[in-house]
Structure formats: C-alpha cells, structure tokens
Amino acid sequence: MFTSLKKVATFSFLVWISQYSGSNSCSSSLVKHIPQTGSNLTFDRVLVEDTVHPEHLHEEHHHHHPEEHHEPHHEEHHHHHPEEHHEPHHEEHHHHHPHPHHHHHHHPPHHHHHLGHHHHHHHAAHHHHHEEHHHHHHAAHHHHHEEHHHHHHAAHHHPWFHHHHLGYHHHHAPHHHHHHHHAPHHHHHHHHAPHHHHHHHHAPHHHHHHHHAPHHHHHHHHGHHHHHHHHHGHHHHHHHHHGHHHHHHHHHDAHHHHHHHHDAHHHHHHHHDAHHHHHHHHDAHHHHHHHHDAHHHHHHHHDAHHHHHHHDAHHHHHHHHDAHHHHHHHHDAHHHHHHHHDAHHHHHHHH
C-alpha cells in the first residue's frame, strides 16, 4: 500500500526507518520519489508498508560489541568478548576482564572509577564492584569463590583472565581471610591464623571470601573509608573488624575492600593477600569476576585507598569500620566473624 506523507518527517528519519526494513524497497522508493524542496519535504507514493521496528533487547549490563546479537536473557554483569554468543542464562557477576583495569558492575569504565581515594559502590584505585561479590578471586594471586568456586587460586592462576594476578598483591593482607577470616589470627567461616584457612584458607596470606590485611575491608574497606559500609582508620561495618577481624565474605588487605577488593591495590569480589584467592583473585594486578590490578576494580576494587561498597584506606561503605568497630559483626584485634579481618578489615568488606 502506498501512502502520501506530507511534512511528516525528514528524509534522514525515513532512511533510518528504512534500515530496519526487510528490503531496500523503501529506501530506493524514497530516493526515487522524494523531491528536494528545501526544509519541507513532500513525499508522494512512498512505500512504508514493510518497515519494522528494531527489536528491543533487555540486558542489564551487557558489554558487547554492537554487532553481537544476544538471545534474551538476564545477565547482571556479563563481560565477554564481543564475538561470543551467549545463550540465555543468569549470571550474577560474570566479568571477565583481560585487563588489569576493569571495572564492573561492570561499569563502563566510568561506571565507577576510583583512584587515589575513591569510594563507590565500589572503589579501588580505580575500580568498583558489585556488592554481589562473588566470583572473585583472591590471593597474592588467587581468588576464590565467595562460595569458593568458580575461582582459581594459586599464586597466579585464574581462568584465562577470569582473574589475573600478578606482581604481588594480596588481597588480604598477609593476614586476612574472610568468609574467612584472617588476621594474624582469626578464623571464620574460615579460620586463619597467621596461617589458617577455611572455606578459605589463609596463611599470612590468605584470603577469604575476603581477605584482610592489616588494613582492608571489604564490602568495605578501610584504611579509612566508608561506604555502604564505612570504614575508618578503623571501621566497622555490617561487620566490624578491628586490629584483626574479619567478616563475612570480605577480605581486606592493608587497603582493600571487598565485594570489594582490597589490597594495596586490589579488590575483590574479594581479593586476598599476598597469596590468596577467592572467588576472586587478586594480584598486585588482577581482576576478578572482577579483576583487579594495582588498580583494578571489582565489583569493587580498591587500591591503596579506595573503598567501595567497599572502602579502603579511606572509604566507608554500607559498612563502617573504625579502628575498632563492630557491627553485625564485631572484631577486635583478633576476632573473626562471619568475617574475619586482620589488622584492620572488616567485612562484607575487606579492608
């Protein structure tokens, strides 16, 4: 059917529409029938019958190349190579990052970036993470699954890039752990003494669901941070950690955070110390479902000072932490909790 259209749209608009047509008949008709009469265009006998609207796809945070076509599915944070085709599935935070600097929730590079001192849902020197926190790696070069799986751990491993780690990091201080607690002496879901382990193991270098080193925090970090969790030189949080605490699912290093990563520069879903891993791996430079590097991000990353949902040297988060904090979990020079923390960490957040 042909319709006469007058002063209805611009040529460019129709051309845009024609791009979604099953054939070129519309655009060829436009080119053939539209007279150029200045700003006002008159369209005679323009074929508009077969135009279609672009399909709307739902993707929460899908970072793919535009040319990819994805089947409808729910992915909270799926970061794959553009050439990948994914079947519908649910992934809470699947983030792979081949680079030492990524971020997630994944936020586009800016979703949250952190540096020097940041904080964010996630923060890291430059990262941030997803509060979800899992699928993270930790260890000087390891990671673990918050649940502890989906992750590799070793001084340096991690699936492809699922997590990279290198240099040295720690996610959670020489002594941390989380879900596992680690302080020179803590334990928790995981226990860690200068060397313990738990769901996660941690030795002077462990990690936990989160690890913590003298100062990290997770979901929150603290050197001094705060965030959803707040952290302070000493903070506390949903979980608080003190000289040595831990929390749940949080790792903390001198300065990390968890759900957030923590290391001098890491982050985690959780990262962990010189050598830990977790669902998250962390190295001086890793990333994990989030990767973290000296500057990574993770669901939250944290660097010397970041915080995020996690906070580091100076951040705060859902969780607050103070030199001595307490919270849903309290931790003292040496405590543990669902989260353990070392010299200074806290959970759900590491420090």
Swiss-Prot record:
Residues 57-351 are annotated as: Disordered. Residues 59-90 are annotated as: 2 X 16 AA tandem repeats. Residues 92-351 have a biased composition (Basic residues). Residues 1-23 form the signal peptide. Residues 173-351 are annotated as: 18 X 10 AA tandem repeats. The keyword Glycoprotein applies. This is Histidine-rich glycoprotein.
